[in-house]
């Protein structure tokens, strides 16, 4: 991945599939499906024999010095290791921050570190420096215009290729607040229906146990587009969730 830039998740996955695995990645956003998908692709590419060695580095659970020690330890056997560090802003000590930044500037090639920053509003000096040094991959839920291609991609992974636009629209309608929720709905439908069964919008509604939630930016977009009915729908949803 080129440094100091934003990379879209689809391009990042293609690069990993092509065998280009960087020693450090930064994932920015909170769509669990995209997070899991990218990590799975890295696992497959980084450990081709299937023997995955992955460790979670959580600042709230580990001593800061232990996190640095694990990253910088020299393995005499040069075995590959994958580390996933969530919420790097949890690293507080000045010395620890400096050592962490030094590592991501000069990482060990037999290790792969995936840093997850789920909050776009995190403006801490450490997070800014991390993004400036490594760049980042956007794993926020895509805008609605791009959701359709992801829905079809998920169905293809389930071996379902004959999916109508009406089915795609139904899924986005009920679960389009995140790819994670869409993936759950697709899993349910594909598990219940036989492989040769034609999936219909009625199937989506029948098996769905999810009611879509909306974000504030979607309300502002609907208002800007002068879409009254959608503005009212999203506004009611936001108010209902705020009052509960």
Language-model region placement:
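Conserved beta/loop motifs at nucleotide-recognition and modification sites
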Residues: 1-244
């Amino acid at each position: 991945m080129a440094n100091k830039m934003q990379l879209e998740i689809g391009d990042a996955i293609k690069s990993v599939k092509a065998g280009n695995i960087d020693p450090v990645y930064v994932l920015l956003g909170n769509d669990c499906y995209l997070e899991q998908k990218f990590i799975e692709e890295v696992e497959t590419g980084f450990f081709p024999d299937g023997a995955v060695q992955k460790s979670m580095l959580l600042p709230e659970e580990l001593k800061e010095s232990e996190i640095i020690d694990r990253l910088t330890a020299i393995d005499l056997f040069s075995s590959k290791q994958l580390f996933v560090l969530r919420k790097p802003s949890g690293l507080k000590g000045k010395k620890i921050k400096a050592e962490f930044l030094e590592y991501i500037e000069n990482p060990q090639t037999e290790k792969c570190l995936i840093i997850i920053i789920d909050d776009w509003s995190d403006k801490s000096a450490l997070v800014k420096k991390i993004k400036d040094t490594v760049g980042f991959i956007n794993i926020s839920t895509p805008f609605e215009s791009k959701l359709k291609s992801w829905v079809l991609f998920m169905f293809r992974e389930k071996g379902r290729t004959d999916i109508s636009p009406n089915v795609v629209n139904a899924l986005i309608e009920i679960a389009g607040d995140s790819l994670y929720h869409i993936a759950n709905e697709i899993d349910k439908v594909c598990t219940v229906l036989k492989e040769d069964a034609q999936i219909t919008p009625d199937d989506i509604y029948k098996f769905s146990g999810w009611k879509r939630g909306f974000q504030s930016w979607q309300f502002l977009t609907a208002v800007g587009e002068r879409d009254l009915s959608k503005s009212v729908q999203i506004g009611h949803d936001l108010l209902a969730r705020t009052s509960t």
